[in-house]
Amino acid sequence: GAAPDFRWDASGYKGTVIHTLYRPSAPEWEEANRMVREGLQYYSEQWYRYPYPNMTSIEGPVEGMEYPMITFCPRAPAREDRQWVIAHELGHQWVPMIVGSNERLYPWMDEGFNTFIDLANAARYFAGTPYGDSIEVHPLHLYADHALPGQEQPLILHPVESTDLFWTGYQKPALMMQTLRYEVLGQERFDRSFREYLRTWAYKHPTPADFFRLMRDVSGMDLDFFWRAWIYTTARLDQAVDSVATAGGAQKVFLSNRGGMTLPLEMDLTYDDGSTDRITLPVEMWNL
């Protein structure tokens, strides 16, 4: 054959033939075909059906690179790292291969959206393990080290101007999408909106304005406040209890949003009898 020194595994998913090729020196890749197949199934069923007849993932002395229907990945001996890079390069089949956003201008629409979907895929693949149960919050754990006051840059900057592309291109936009999904819109409304974005802009070239407009129209919420904070500025979340007053036997808690970022508010309450309660107030409480 053309590559006699490579091992070849094959499987399929709904008419798509899935190939993995790897060197004998990378026996860990025996699981790779399953990783590709389960990732392709997840992305297809959760977001947008994979439209091509083949998908090939090849192991080699590379960092990771994607092309239509073929990806190149490093050996990555650690199982979690291997699954992540395989699923990440696979995810690029959706962005920017199917939905052709301009990664040279807006990496957050490419690497960021892809990081968002592949973290969710990793959580599913490793479900029930400490890694699977925590991987989606990985970008949040990076926040303190990368969102440094006076140094952090807005996502909207061109990548050539970025001093921390790992944060502005990959991790912060993934955190942004997670926050929009789990905290602002809710999972059902977000998923319906993002699926429609992928469907509407498949084989086209959306700009940020196209994405904003579609998410607004499908979700039914004006999200300008959200995009302004996350993409056009480096706003921070700073919610506070301003004061507590007693009136008519009841206590009133006065809250304020002191930062430039507007999000729902979560508050723990302790009552006179010692019982506690955690309440979440929706983002609309700030009278957007």
Feature annotation, model-predicted:
Residues 223-224, 237-288:
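Beta-strand-rich binding/interaction modules
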Residues 72-137, 194:
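Zinc-dependent metallopeptidase catalytic helix centered on the HExxH motif
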Residues 105, 111-179, 183-184:
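Acidic/His/Gly-enriched intrinsically disordered linker/tail segments
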Residues 31-38, 42, 68, 81, ...:
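Extracytoplasmic/secreted proteins, especially bacterial periplasmic and envelope-associated proteins
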Residues 25-30, 102-104, 160-167, 197-202:
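Active-site rim elements
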Residues 15-17, 49-55, 91, 172, ...:
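Loop/turn elements at helix/coil->beta-strand transitions in domains of secreted/extracellular proteins
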Residues 166-253:
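Amphipathic alpha-helical substructures
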Residues 1-87, 116:
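Hydrophobic helix-coil surface modules that form long, contiguous segments used
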